């Protein structure tokens, strides 16, 4: 079992360092605000004219352009989108790093697949909260924390491990627990989870279930409720207590169908394709494809985004959400669309 580091295991070295947070999106705003509220000295690095600049200032944070921010800092956390990181790092970050600095990333993609090259005299680390930034921030404000992974890619100073862990503590993650990993393991498992299960696999499963019912003549609205809308109820149960809690909470009929039908959906053919997806990630094939797609302007990516947005499941979902919102706004005792009884 991996060791879990908690607040009592970790020092406060990060509070003695000047920290640059590059980016002020979902993760950037949470890291910067949590660090500040933990007593750290933080500057947000952005490009001049960024829409996030006034937002960061309104939050009470110091903001400067990226080169200036990096020169000022001793610890630099890169929180720009993956596809924007390589040119920004090459042109604005790397030339301004000093010997003994700590360069941090929240995802290992660009380091693991050699899209950025951190100078050898600079420490290299990873702190990856396992959830979106707005949740990281809200948990911190509630006195709670979000689990995170950490890794040390290079320890040029002999102090990198303690400082990386201290950063994780500063953003509140040690309240929940911090697990050690490597850049390779974090990157490959994260990409696989996104592609085969959480995003790619799940999206395809939801659409396939919806389409199967609609093609069989069932109402699209019922197909949406059964195959998409109720997913949150199931996921919440799994989050609370695993698959066992979910199976305990559903009917015996649903549980029996889980055991008998599930293996028909996820059969050996699906498992083999999942192994192929993992192999493409491990070999760097997916990374190369994604890098080339961005270098070409992302036209294929944007076309897929537009096509998926036009799927019937999106239109039906939007209609049902609007109907639910209308019902929620109706006065008590006066059902929307009907007479008061």
UniProtKB/Swiss-Prot annotation:
Pathway: Amino-acid biosynthesis; L-isoleucine biosynthesis; L-isoleucine from 2-oxobutanoate: step 2/4; Amino-acid biosynthesis; L-valine biosynthesis; L-valine from pyruvate: step 2/4. It catalyses: (2R)-2,3-dihydroxy-3-methylbutanoate + NADP(+) = (2S)-2-acetolactate + NADPH + H(+); (2R,3R)-2,3-dihydroxy-3-methylpentanoate + NADP(+) = (S)-2-ethyl-2-hydroxy-3-oxobutanoate + NADPH + H(+). Keywords: Amino-acid biosynthesis, Branched-chain amino acid biosynthesis, Magnesium, Metal-binding, NADP, Oxidoreductase. The keyword Repeat does not apply. One of its GO terms (cellular component) is cytosol. Residues 1-181 form the KARI N-terminal Rossmann domain. InterPro entries: 6-PGluconate_DH-like_C_sf, KARI, KARI_C, KARI_N, KARI_prok, NAD(P)-bd_dom_sf. Pfam families: KARI_C, KARI_N. NADP(+) binds at residues 24-27, 50, 52, 82-85, 133. One of its GO terms (molecular function) is magnesium ion binding. The keyword Ion transport does not apply. Signal peptide: none annotated. Binds 2 magnesium ions per subunit. SUPFAM superfamilies: 6-phosphogluconate dehydrogenase C-terminal domain-like, NAD(P)-binding Rossmann-fold domains. GO terms for biological process: isoleucine biosynthetic process; L-valine biosynthetic process. Substrate binds at residue 251. The active site is at residue 107. Mg(2+) 2 binds at residues 190, 226, 230. Residues 182-327 form the KARI C-terminal knotted domain. NCBIfam families: ilvC (TIGR00465), PRK05479.1 (NF004017), PRK13403.1 (NF009940). Involved in the biosynthesis of branched-chain amino acids (BCAA). Catalyzes an alkyl-migration followed by a ketol-acid reduction of (S)-2-acetolactate (S2AL) to yield (R)-2,3-dihydroxy-isovalerate. In the isomerase reaction, S2AL is rearranged via a Mg-dependent methyl migration to produce 3-hydroxy-3-methyl-2-ketobutyrate (HMKB). In the reductase reaction, this 2-ketoacid undergoes a metal-dependent reduction by NADPH to yield (R)-2,3-dihydroxy-isovalerate. This is Ketol-acid reductoisomerase (NADP(+)).
